[in-house]
């Protein structure tokens, strides 16, 4: 039995608009999640006892409902896997990237006006980073990613989003 995915809240002095990210496998099982502190974002009235981290997790995984499944049509997917904003009605937009193997990368931001080209590059880089993690002989496929190197590189990529 694999260990559950852990998420940590990371604080920083010069915040990126990215407030949460997740890497999810083909069966919608989380492999990595991370929530970031952001001073400009105020929670819309949370449910009783709900933390900011729980609210962001819920937002990310609710967005999976808007991503085409395995039986997707050509019109539902783009050639490069970038789906753009998948939840336009939510207070925080979630941008998605899906690979041909069904791996999903979700990025929740405080801004809808992020440059799509830059965002595509960053999501592709996160995908490449996950592939590098797969090449680690000590990583067991389809289990939560616990590598600090992976987490630190994601933080570096996140800082590029402006």
Please provide the spans of the model-predicted regions.
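Acidic, low-complexity cytosolic segments
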Residues: 2-20, 26-162
